[in-house]
Design a protein with these regions (language model features):
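Boundary at the C-terminal end of the N-terminal hydrophobic targeting segment
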Residues: 38-44
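Bacterial N-terminal signal peptides that target proteins for export
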Residues: 7-28
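Intrinsically disordered, low-complexity N-terminal segments that are enriched in acidic
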Residues: 44-149
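Secondary-structure boundary elements
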Residues: 136-137, 144-229, 240, 316-340
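Bacterial N-terminal signal peptides
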Residues: 26-36
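Solvent-exposed loop/turn segments at secondary-structure junctions
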Residues: 146-147, 212-213, 231, 258-261, ...
Length: 340
């Protein structure tokens, strides 16, 4: 069978959408998998309720269940060599994650997790053989603790990093649909932030984006076209804010949550300590804060997936491939993403 991928149709695909995909196998080692998730990197330390005055503050914490996985059926014949990857929630300063349940069929021989460069966590599922008409499933239930973010107590000393490290510098270039080097975008960013620095400069860019681009649903078109057309949805406003921020040397990235996205920007204090701050590009104004507590799926907008070589991905979607064998069936897959 040919390789199949599902890219988000303007936003991450909605839960319950049936598409053709393979899945990764798993042995029911819940304790082992839970330990893997619990082994959070330093970036994932949960926000302290008494954080530094210049850092993001932690608001209310919401606990929720979130299911991720797939159900695959071999139609028209047997399927072999099924291999699937799908993104799963990971830990971030405002989100804690742990596995609380798993539902895995015997046909699934291996299930594991991996983290791509840039920080996207994937579930990898392998099904060596699936007889005609049979069904296999691999569904994992996560428990998320998702904190709202409040504006720092002291923003006056926050500034744009002069010498960001390699990880932060990665959020200064171009990304799919984020045309950082577009002359009109760069000129608008320069005008918006003229005479300002740090927090005030980023806020001026934020207000300019919301003033120049009307929030309206439509096709995915990116920052350049959104500015030219004067309208776009949450992705366009997010793309334009990120492009303008990066044009002024301000690291910025996309935060993908269930059914929505928004940008984050990075500033440092006088000691060089840095933080990511969110803002709501579309909808109710929220700068440097995020009242929404939707499940965070990914952060970033320029990923590389070894299963999709040569492609720059703004969002890492589900992926399936299987062996091409004469008389083989067609794997019909329902991707599961429920909760929030």
């Amino acid at each position: 069978m040919p390789t199949q991928t599902r890219e988000p149709l303007h936003m991450p695909p909605p839960p319950g959408l049936s598409v053709i995909r393979p899945h990764h196998a798993t042995i029911g080692l819940l304790a082992l998998l839970g330990a893997a998730v619990a082994a959070a990197p330093a970036r994932a330390q949960f926000l302290d309720a008494t954080a530094a005055a210049a850092g993001p503050g932690r608001g209310d914490v919401r606990t929720l269940k979130y299911k991720v996985g797939l159900v695959v059926t071999a139609e028209g014949g047997p399927c072999t060599g099924l291999y699937a990857t799908l993104p799963v929630p990971d830990e971030w300063p405002e989100q804690k994650v742990r596995i609380v349940a798993e539902d895995v069929s015997p046909a699934v021989r291996n299930l594991r997790y991996r983290t791509l460069p840039g920080g996207v966590k994937q579930m990898v599922v392998e099904i060596p053989e699936l007889p005609a008409g049979k069904q296999a499933r691999a569904v994992v239930t996560f428990e998320l603790e998702r904190a709202a973010i409040v504006v720092p107590d002291d923003t006056a000393g926050l500034r744009i990093p002069e010498k960001p490290d390699r990880a932060i510098k990665a959020h200064l270039g171009t990304s799919p649909y984020i045309e950082t080097r577009d002359p009109k975008i760069a000129a608008l960013a320069k005008t918006a932030g003229k005479g300002l620095d740090g927090w005030r400069k980023v806020e001026a860019i934020y207000d300019t984006v919301r003033d120049k681009v009307e929030y309206r649903n439509g096709e995915l078109k990116g920052a350049r076209r959104a500015l030219a057309d004067g309208w776009g949805d949450c992705e366009e406003l997010t793309c334009l804010f990120i492009a303008m921020a990066r044009a002024e040397g301000i690291p910025a990235r996309t935060v993908w949550v269930e059914g929505h996205c928004y940008p984050e920007f990075y500033l440092v204090d006088a000691t060089g300590q840095g933080w990511w701050f969110p803002c709501q590009a579309a909808g109710t104004r929220a700068f440097g804060a995020m009242p929404d507590q939707l499940p965070i799926l990914q952060k970033g907008d320029n990923f590389r997936d070894p299963d999709r070589p040569g492609k720059s991905l703004r969002y890492v979607s589900e992926f399936l491939k299987g062996a091409t064998v004469k008389g083989a069936g067609d794997p019909q897959v329902e991707w599961i993403r429920e909760g929030g």
